[in-house]
Amino acid sequence: MFSKILVPVVGSQADDEAIKLACTLAKRVKDKEKENGKIWAVSVVAIKRALPLDAEIDSEIKKAEDLLNHVQSIAEEEEFEIETDVLQAREVGPAIVDEAVERGVHLILMGITYKKQFGQFSLGNVVPYVLKNSPCPVILYQQ
């Protein structure tokens, strides 16, 4: 069972559904064990190489915090408490994988949107990186 779930969020409608699904999965753990599972929602702010890694990019951090407040309110509607965190990194994919390793999660649940690049469906760079390097199962929720 997935008692520790990491949900990276980017601000799409799929994030809302991914958080709801994560809450449902984490609540199922309570049936088997005495307490709910744990969910971490993270938003990764990509820092350009020209800037120091700990650079304060107020507008980007504010957007990430607003996004995390939004997903936290969705979790509250589902009667579930989640932890949120803003991560700053050069690359989004490695930051997600590192966070999964650090927290010892059992599942990464990512909401994705249907994107076309050059007329074909594209997952971008982040999702394939996470799928290839994740230490745990990954569920993609397509909106």
Task: Please place each PLM-identified region on the residue numbering.
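Glycine-rich, Arg-bearing micro-motifs that act as flexible, cationic patches
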Residues: 110-132
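Structural beta-alpha unit
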Residues: 77-108
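Small/aliphatic-rich secondary-structure junction motif
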Residues: 1-55, 74-78, 83
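Short secondary-structure boundary segments
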Residues: 43-45, 111-113, 143
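Short, flexible loop segments at boundaries between secondary-structure elements
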Residues: 133-143
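Short glycine-rich, flexible loops that bind phosphorylated cofactors or substrates
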Residues: 14, 92, 116-118
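Solvent-exposed polar/charged
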Residues: 24-27, 101, 132
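Short, solvent-exposed amphipathic alpha-helices that sit
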Residues: 21, 60-71, 95-97
